[in-house]
Every structure is written in C-alpha cells, then in structure tokens.
C-alpha cells in the first residue's frame, strides 16, 4: 500500500522523468493549483514550460468541521503543467497511474467531458474529468484563455485530487483514515492525526469568528495595492495582492457576508485584476524578449 506521502513521491519521480521542473507550493492561500504562478502566469505568452508541484488549496466555504469524510476546507492537489501540450498527454497521464500501481486493463478509467472555467482568473479551457472506478480523481484541461488572453501555444494542465486518489488506493471511506506515513517505530500517522483539528478550528473560524468588517477593509486594500503595483509596473507583486483579494473574497463568501448580487460584482473586480496582471506579465516577458524561447532555440542548435 502506498502512503499519502509515497503517492506524492511517486508522482514527483514520474514527472521528473518527463522533464518537469519540480517546484514547491505557492506560499500563499490559493483555491487551486491553477493559481500558482507556475500555471497562471506561465500559461501566458509563447515560452515553453513544464512544471509539477503539490499545492495546498483552501476553499473556506467547503469546511465541514471535520465531520464530513470527503469534504475539506484545506486539501492537496498535485499539479502538472505542460506547455505546449504534447500530443501524447493522455498516454503520459496513464503512465503516471501505472507508476502508482493502477493497471488500466483492470480498472474502469473514464474521461468525462467537463469544460473548465475560473471566473476570478478570467480563465477557461476544454477539459475532462477522469473517473477511476466511479470516483473522480483528476481534471484535464487544455487552456484556451488565461487572464483574458488567448493561450498560444495551448497549455495542458493535469490536476490530481490527492486525497481522492489516496482514498481509492488505500481503499478507505474517510479521508481521515488515510495513512499519511508509517512512522519510524511502525506506528501509522493518519490524515486525522495531521489535519483533523485544523479542519475543526478553521471551519469554526471561517463560518463563525472571522470579522466581516476587517475582511471588507482588507479586500479594498488588496485591490488598491494590486492596481497601484500594476502602474509601476510590477506584475508579480500585483498578482500576489490580487491573490490576497481573492482569498479574502472567499472568506467573506464563507461567512455569508456577501449577497448574491454583490457576489457577482466582487468576482468581476477580481477578474479585472487578473486580466490586468496577465497583460502586465505578458508585456514584461515581451520586453525581455521571451527569454525561454531563446533557451529553446539554443538547445535546438
């Protein structure tokens, strides 16, 4: 049986062999691996890029006080970004399942059409959910736009839901029963031991004790800071301010502090920031002469 951390190590080793830069998680609150600069910003422009990383993801509204067996406000994704998307991307994915000990000939693996959109990032793509014996474990996306900019060349994104994948591989019904690792003395460390208290307390904070007044003020401050930084222009610091605004919005949404009509307006404000950041980043890379294109040309020579 693969432990949770062995699943991560296996994926790291596999995608390392496919020429991916193995990066670290983005060190800010994000709702998905797509928000990491290694995906959102690197999907912009013509430069080639291959990367893989684990991303802790926060979705405050999905918290259930540690009482739901598969619903969490903090969870893990394993993200793979391939640009340009290679024609054999599906074969590469199947290869990763084989590395995890999953034989496609003995399992029901289905690709269910599910186009993807992230309104706050101004991003969308053609995609598929991957179902393994009836459980969704991965999302495939071919990005068409990011930050309102067309993706040329197309970026391929593979997002593994690590908890769901591990629940299948370990044959458990609750995420909290997952074996994180086998301790030095043979004692198992469970997902429950690592994260259950965090789910209880963070859910309590998100739903009951966060200050809406403070969060509204923070949102306005982060939005203003992002706009100010883009005038410099400093695309990367501006993007971090936009990410902070997005997480603050998610906290307000979980707190029930934003009405349905206000929600659409706030999403629009974040989307405007994302689009402005995307354009600023593209412009900055263009001024540099798209250096990774030169690197590729040098390798070809």
Swiss-Prot record:
Gene Ontology, cellular component aspect: cytosol
InterPro entries xref list: aa-tRNA-synth_II/BPL/LPL, Gly-tRNA-synth_heterodimer, Gly-tRNA_ligase_asu
Subcellular localization, as worded in the UniProt entry: Cytoplasm
Record keywords: Aminoacyl-tRNA synthetase, ATP-binding, Cytoplasm, Ligase, Nucleotide-binding, Protein biosynthesis
Example GO BP: glycyl-tRNA aminoacylation
Record GO terms (molecular function): ATP binding; glycine-tRNA ligase activity
Protein EC: 6.1.1.14
First-tier enzyme category under EC: ligase
Domain of life (superkingdom): Bacteria
Catalytic activity, as annotated: tRNA(Gly) + glycine + ATP = glycyl-tRNA(Gly) + AMP + diphosphate
Any single Pfam family the record assigns to this protein: tRNA-synt_2e
Main localization category: cytoplasm
Entry's family note: Belongs to the class-II aminoacyl-tRNA synthetase family.
NCBIfam families assigned: glyQ, PRK09348.1
PANTHER family given in the database record: GLYCINE--TRNA LIGASE, CHLOROPLASTIC_MITOCHONDRIAL 2 (PTHR30075:SF2), GLYCYL-TRNA SYNTHETASE (PTHR30075)
Listed HAMAP family: Gly_tRNA_synth_alpha (MF_00254)
Assembly notes: Tetramer of two alpha and two beta subunits.
The protein, known as: Glycine--tRNA ligase alpha subunit
């Amino acid at each position: 049986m693969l432990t949770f951390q062995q699943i991560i190590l296996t994926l790291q080793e596999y995608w390392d062999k496919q020429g991916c830069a193995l990066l670290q998680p983005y060190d800010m609150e994000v709702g998905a691996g797509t928000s990491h600069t290694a995906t959102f910003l690197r999907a912009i422009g013509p430069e080639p890029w291959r990367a893989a990383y684990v991303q802790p993801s926060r979705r405050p509204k999905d918290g259930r006080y540690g009482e739901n067996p598969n619903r969490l406000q903090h969870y893990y994704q394993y993200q793979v970004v391939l640009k340009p998307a290679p024609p054999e991307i599906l074969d590469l994915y199947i290869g990763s399942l084989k590395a995890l000990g999953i034989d496609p000939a003995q399992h029901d693996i289905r690709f269910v059409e599910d186009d993807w959109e992230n309104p706050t990032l101004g991003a969308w793509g053609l995609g598929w959910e991957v179902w393994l014996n009836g459980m969704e474990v991965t999302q495939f996306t071919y990005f068409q736009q990011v930050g309102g900019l067309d993706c040329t060349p197309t970026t391929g994104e593979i997002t593994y839901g690590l908890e769901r994948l591990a629940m299948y591989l370990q044959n458990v019904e609750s995420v909290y029963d997952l074996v994180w690792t086998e301790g030095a003395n043979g004692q198992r460390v469970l997902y429950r031991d690592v994260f259950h208290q965090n789910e209880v307390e963070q859910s309590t904070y998100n739903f009951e004790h966060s200050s809406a007044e403070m969060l509204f003020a923070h949102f306005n401050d982060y939005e203003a800071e992002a706009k100010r930084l883009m005038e410099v222009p400093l695309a990367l610091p501006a993007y971090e301010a936009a990410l902070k605004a997005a997480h603050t919005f998610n906290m307000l949404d979980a707190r029930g502090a934003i009405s349905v009509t206000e929600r659409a307006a706030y999403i629009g404000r974040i989307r405007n920031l994302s689009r402005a950041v995307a354009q600023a980043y593209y412009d900055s890379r263009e001024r540099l002469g798209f250096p990774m294109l030169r690197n590729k040309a040098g390798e070809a020579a």
